[in-house]
């Protein structure tokens, strides 16, 4: 089974994260940031991933360090779980509606880290979650995993719905990208490596 367990401890955060790419029944998220827990749960469920996260952070300051560091550890786990990337689709994309909002995510498991984020999040805060941290999370995952990730809110009026559409689309796009494909021999690249 393709999986990874990693931990990261700094003076700001303490993170333990387990990711299973081929098992989807075990999802348990505890970051101390309620809205972020909800989004990670949606990502795992819609991507059909097993994901367990335990995080403690300096949320008395704000949630920035916790959200970014969870993104870093998730990216590291994804990179390790994919091993040599043989036989995977490599690319994945998904449009996901959430009521009036539409989110889009495209992924290339390329070995090159890049993140493009486009979306107007008009409400600056949802509970204890600063909405600008949505971009920070995606950027942290992309850089740690060495993937290219494009995330875009096409339209919508409710900030919660916009972010939810993105996290669901992220799960679905990543599922497509990491899926094994019997028609692909080796890695899906003319270079012979990713």
UniProtKB/Swiss-Prot annotation:
Main localization category: cytoplasm
SUPFAM superfamilies: Ribosomal protein S5 domain 2-like
CDD domains (UniProt xref): IGPD
EC id: 4.2.1.19
Family annotation (Pfam families): IGPD
Subcellular localization(s) per the UniProt record: Cytoplasm
Keyword Amino-acid biosynthesis: yes
Keywords: Amino-acid biosynthesis, Cytoplasm, Histidine biosynthesis, Lyase
Pathway(s) this gene product operates in, as recorded in its UniProt entry: Amino-acid biosynthesis; L-histidine biosynthesis; L-histidine from 5-phospho-alpha-D-ribose 1-diphosphate: step 6/9
An annotated GO BP: L-histidine biosynthetic process
Gene Ontology CC: one annotated term: cytoplasm
Cross-referenced PROSITE patterns: IGP_DEHYDRATASE_1 (PS00954), IGP_DEHYDRATASE_2 (PS00955)
GO molecular function: imidazoleglycerol-phosphate dehydratase activity
Keyword Amino-acid biosynthesis among UniProt keywords: yes
Coiled coil feature spans: none
PANTHER family: IMIDAZOLEGLYCEROL-PHOSPHATE DEHYDRATASE (PTHR23133:SF2), IMIDAZOLEGLYCEROL-PHOSPHATE DEHYDRATASE HIS7 (PTHR23133)
Family the UniProt entry places it in: Belongs to the imidazoleglycerol-phosphate dehydratase family.
Protein name, UniProt field: Imidazoleglycerol-phosphate dehydratase
Organism of provenance: Bacillus cereus (strain ATCC 14579 / DSM 31 / CCUG 7414 / JCM 2152 / NBRC 15305 / NCIMB 9373 / NCTC 2599 / NRRL B-3711)
